[in-house]
Amino acid sequence: MDYESIKKHAKAVSEQVLTVRRTIHSRPELSFEEHETADYIAAQLTEAGILFRRIAGTGILARIEGHGDLQRCVVLRADTDALPIWEETGLECASRHDGVMHACGHDMHTACLLGALLVLNRHKSEIAGTVFGLFQ
């Protein structure tokens, strides 16, 4: 896995990551209520051919298997919940849910984790072990 190849693939998914962030930002959900968010993430993972399973109601555990000892693993994690705050930014992607807002960056954490998984999935033959992505 060389830097230039990773950089190229990251650039290739950058618009998708921005779209994911804006979509999630506009549809915030409080802790343990992130059903729409989980469905959206699941659809993105399915489209990319990344294996995953739903866990704990609104969580998702994605899995990218490389080669060699698959017991060797790393877990990348992102929060998916929003806060009970009114958004008054006037942004095009502002919250559509009254009194709930992604005010602490969890929408970006989620989008970046998805982006990382998209890039790593393209390089899975070069990964010695397993990469998990936990959307929580």
Where in this protein do the model-derived segments appear?
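Acidic/His- and Gly-rich active-site-bordering loop/insert found
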Residues: D2-H102, A111-L114, L118-G129
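Divalent metal-dependent hydrolysis catalytic cores, especially in the metallo-beta-lactamase
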Residues: T130-Q136
